[in-house]
C-alpha cells in the first residue's frame, strides 16, 4: 500500500500536546510513526562521545508521533486534508480530496 504521508510533506498535528501545530516530516518510520520538525520535543540525557567530539548533556530532540495523529496540510484551503490516489499518464499520484489538487 502506498504511503499517504511522505518525507518533506507539511503536516498538522490532530491530537496531543502539540495539537494544531504544523511542521515538515523529517522521517517516516516503518512502525507507523513519523518524526516532524519541531513537534513532540523531548529532553534526552546524552553521554559524551569523545571520539566524535560530542559533548554530553541534556539535548532536546523530536520524538516520533503516530501517523494517525497527523494529517497532511493543504496550503490552498489552510486546513488539514485527506489524501487520495489516482493514475495520470501511467503514474500513481497523490491528490487532496477537498479540491482534487495534486500533491507536489
Curated annotation (Swiss-Prot):
It holds the Pfam family KOW. InterPro entries: KOW, Rib_uL2_dom2, Ribosomal_uL24, Ribosomal_uL24_CS, Ribosomal_uL24_KOW, Translation_prot_SH3-like_sf. The keyword Ribosomal protein applies. Keywords: Ribonucleoprotein, Ribosomal protein, RNA-binding, rRNA-binding. SUPFAM superfamilies: Translation proteins SH3-like domain. CDD domains: KOW_RPL26. One of two assembly initiator proteins, it binds directly to the 5'-end of the 23S rRNA, where it nucleates assembly of the 50S subunit. One of the proteins that surrounds the polypeptide exit tunnel on the outside of the subunit. NCBIfam families: rplX_bact. PANTHER family: MITOCHONDRIAL RIBOSOMAL PROTEIN L24. This is Large ribosomal subunit protein uL24. The gene is rplX.
Amino acid at each position: 500500500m502506498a504511503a499517504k504521508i511522505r518525507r518533506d510533506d507539511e503536516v498538522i498535528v490532530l491530537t496531543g500536546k502539540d495539537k494544531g501545530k504544523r511542521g515538515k516530516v523529517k522521517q517516516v518510520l516503518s512502525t507507523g510513526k513519523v518524526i516532524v520538525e519541531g513537534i513532540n520535543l523531548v529532553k534526552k540525557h546524552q553521554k559524551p562521545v569523545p571520539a566524535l567530539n560530542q559533548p554530553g548533556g541534556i539535548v532536546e530532540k523530536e520524538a516520533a508521533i503516530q501517523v494517525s495523529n497527523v494529517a497532511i496540510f493543504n496550503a490552498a484551503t489552510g486546513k488539514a486534508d485527506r489524501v487520495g490516489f489516482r493514475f495520470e499518464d501511467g503514474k500513481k499520484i497523490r491528490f487532496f480530496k477537498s479540491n482534487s489538487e495534486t500533491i507536489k
